[in-house]
Amino acid sequence: MHFVSYSLCYDVRSNIMEQPIYFYEPDENHGFLANFYPCSITVSGTCWPSSEHYYQAQKFDDVRLQEKVLRAEDAAQAFRLSREYQQWQRHDWYDIRVEVMRFIVREKFLQNTPLAHQLLATGDTELKEHSHKDAFWGDGGDGHGRNELGRILMMVREELQEHAPYNLVQFIDSAKLPTQWGTFQMYGFIEKATGKEHLALVYGDIEQQAAPLIRLHSECLTGDALFSARCDCGFQLAKALQNIVAEGAGVLLYLRQEGRGIGLINKIRAYHLQDDGADTVEANEQLGFGADMRDYAFCRGILSFLGIERVRLMTNNPRKVKALQLANIEVTERVPLQEGNNPHNHQYLRTKADKLGHMFDRNFVKP
């Protein structure tokens, strides 16, 4: 699926006056907003190829005509068939058509999670169907139209904004990320509760995986970028990316939760205390923090955006498994990620096992 960039929409925070988002053709920018956009929607056990198919079929009481519209090869043909059978249109159609449209547009986004996230990524920008042929559903081409479809889309957007997983993160943009192991697609998100920026690195076709291999990796500047041997983070990051490429598809979430959530400067303070003899948990507590301040609930929003409900999770940390389960993500398997044991971090790993419950093989971390 193609995801539209909304980096400009996010600039609303800097008081930039935004132009409306115009949509019409399904294969153009913002085409997912159009009724002609192909996406499956199930209503009472029947799968409709698009919201346009459903809307046009409801013009008729005759189930045989509804069936013909349902079987139309695309939305354009569904529209043409409704015109062809117009003489059999139900007498109260103009009284109920807005209600029908509201229903099917709402179902379109409720049943297609990636589209719902795309809709939310438009922020508060006005949405307009830019149709010069339709001054009821569209803007009439020159702005004089009622734009009823745009109004419905904005109503659905407002509703989604109030509920998880849609209120957890906002998708901003995506780009390719070539690495020494392979090329990933990098997606950027803003966590709505904190304003923190997080990444999803996606490799391969995750839609073909019943439960993609994933990793929740908390940012560690010292380990990931400065090659520190005090922890196992950098080693785990490299191995996780390698494992995903070897698998053929998978996701690494790079989470801005430096120092188990206490931040970079406080991590340096904690390192100082460790230099003086404290272990990693004691150092955090001496600074007034909990042993682990990280929160993973918002990850549900990112995984939802990617269409992921079941995962195989690379981790040694049972807390991550539990956090995803509490977020209604099924963890079908925990995949150990035991990397980087060395003389500089052996006691750190031992403390993670003894005090934080991390699961290591005996031959990896010895007493």
Curated annotation (Swiss-Prot):
Q: Name one GO biological process term.
A: riboflavin biosynthetic process
- List, alphabetically, the GO terms of the cellular component aspect: cytosol
Question: In the Enzyme Commission scheme, what number(s) does this protein have?
Answer: 3.2.2.-, 3.5.4.25
Give GO MF terms, alphabetically. Answer: GTP binding; GTP cyclohydrolase II activity; hydrolase activity, hydrolyzing N-glycosyl compounds; zinc ion binding
Q: Which SUPFAM superfamilies match?
A: RibA-like, YbiA-like
User: What is the official name of this protein in its record?
Assistant: Riboflavin biosynthesis protein VVA0006
- What pathway or pathways are given for this protein in its record? Cofactor biosynthesis; riboflavin biosynthesis; 5-amino-6-(D-ribitylamino)uracil from GTP: step 1/4
Locate the residues binding Zn(2+). Answer: C220, C231, C233
Required co-factor? Answer: Zn(2+)
- Active-site residues (renumbered): D292 (proton acceptor), R294 (nucleophile)
Name its species: Vibrio vulnificus (strain YJ016)
Q: Which residues bind GTP?
A: R215, L216, H217, S218, E219, Q236, E258, G259, R260, T280, T315, K320
How many cofactors are bound and how?
Answer: Binds 1 zinc ion per subunit.
Question: What's its catalytic activity?
Answer: 2,5-diamino-6-hydroxy-4-(5-phosphoribosylamino)-pyrimidine + H2O = 2,5,6-triamino-4-hydroxypyrimidine + D-ribose 5-phosphate; 5-amino-6-(5-phospho-D-ribosylamino)uracil + H2O = 5,6-diaminouracil + D-ribose 5-phosphate; GTP + 4 H2O = 2,5-diamino-6-hydroxy-4-(5-phosphoribosylamino)-pyrimidine + formate + 2 phosphate + 3 H(+)
Q: Which UniProt keywords apply?
A: Glycosidase, GTP-binding, Hydrolase, Metal-binding, Multifunctional enzyme, Nucleotide-binding, Riboflavin biosynthesis, Zinc
